[in-house]
Amino acid sequence: MAASSSVRPTPTGPQVFINFRGKDLRNGFLSFLEPAMREANINVFIDKDEVVGTDLVNLFVRIQESRVAVVIFSKDYTSSEWCLDELAEIKDCINQGGLNAIPIFYKLAPSSVLELKGGFGDTFRVLKEKYKNDPERTQKWQEALESIPKLKGLRLAEKSDRNEREFMNEMILEIQKALWQIAMKGNPKVESNSKGGFLVPARRLTIAHSDNPEKWTWSAIYDRPHKADIEIATMINTHALIKISGDFHTRKLIPGKKYEVVFIVSLDDTSLGWKNEVTLTLKVVMSDEAANVKAKKLCLDEYIGENWVDIPVGDFEAPQEKEDAKIFFSMYQLLNTERKSGLVVKGFAIRPAQ
């Protein structure tokens, strides 16, 4: 089978931290899981990504930066104090409400972890004895081992009808579900910020073909201006028409104040096919159906390589208090059939004009 010519952007969005133990696991199962997660547009962190020579504090920071931790319990897990320190930090972050965890029982019975049975428990007790002069540390290990395995997780038995590839796909679906739930909790229909602006996020827009995973993928990021997790849409590969549109009711705006609409996007260095113009439109429809339409054309290739950019669509004056209006905005390219990729859509923002 020929390799796909599409280039996937580097995954962005909430970080997923992998907590595990063992070279065999790293060189085997994880060596396939990691690229599969990146292919699924999951922003995964494994400690090999850390600079060699850094200490445990750096990994604690990585855990604190993450929104999901995948804890892979295996036979050798309790032989590592480093791994247990990470687990204790994961528990602390869960308690603080900033992290979700998914326990994975890799060729290990959940009861072996929960009850510290067999070799898993014996190894833990040996390690606990080794650090008997640091009871606070070992107590944190024990508490983490008692709580995290009780969370909803997945198990691959020693002898299973499923192969590792099938189990890996199940893991990825569970992680994507967790990320989606995080995004939905913070994904506002229309969210305001401290500057009086509003964001209509990508998931609330109509994006042609965004339900086709071969053309678009969805992931979640933390949006600092709006202090919320929101979903973003990333174009993978399409020859089809592009149309992204949305609407907003003006009742939330200050009457008589001038506002601007901006399209918030990013195009990384791998983006292709943006030399031809796209059209941006803004339509203001009053309650009496009187309408004012503005349109402009521009090339998006000038924005390639930048971080998030605000592309002006147009401005308008919010109607007076007793009047009513709705605005409609869009970005489209209907005729060009050149292959395109790399566009990341955060949403449209409505904010006071400068």
Curated annotation (Swiss-Prot):
Q: Which domain of life is it from?
A: Eukaryota
Tell me, which GO biological process terms does this entry list?
A: signal transduction
The annotated active site, in chain numbering, is: 86
Q: What is this protein called?
A: Protein PHLOEM PROTEIN 2-LIKE A8
Indicate the enzyme's highest-level EC class: hydrolase
Q: Which PROSITE patterns match?
A: TIR
Q: Mind telling me which SMART domains this protein's record contains?
A: TIR (SM00255)
UniProt keywords, alphabetically: Hydrolase, NAD
Q: Which residues form the TIR domain?
A: 12-179
| GO molecular-function terms, A-Z | carbohydrate binding; NAD+ nucleosidase activity, cyclic ADP-ribose generating
The answer to whether keyword Nuclease applies is no
Q: Which InterPro entries match?
A: PP2-like, TIR_dom, Toll_tir_struct_dom_sf
Q: Reaction(s) catalyzed by this protein?
A: NAD(+) + H2O = ADP-D-ribose + nicotinamide + H(+)
Q: What is known of its domains?
A: The TIR domain mediates NAD(+) hydrolase (NADase) activity. Self-association of TIR domains is required for NADase activity.
Q: What is its EC number?
A: 3.2.2.6
